Amino acid sequence: MKYKIVLDAGHGGSDSGNIGNGITEKEYSLLISNYIKERLDALGIENIVTRNTDRFLSDDDRVNIISSAFGNESNVIVLSNHLRNEDGEGLEVVYALRN
């Protein structure tokens, strides 16, 4: 099965996310998303990003971008972190183990 990956950098635009040491979560998530995209491109793995600049996306915007790119395909992986929790600390990585 060939995977298609959506890199969904959380936050953006007017939504900064959390701030630590003067750097916003939206900045980190965009940097990480763009880095992963470069690596996936180099490996020939099909992918899209929901945003590649500092702009706000609603949840509906994110869903529409994904649907426009891949429709209802079941082999899409979405990497995202835009939870609305102001008490969070640290880094979150979510992944699926599959056979």
Tell what function each PLM region has.
Residues 2-4, 27-99:
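Active-site-proximal helix/loop segments of hydrolytic enzymes
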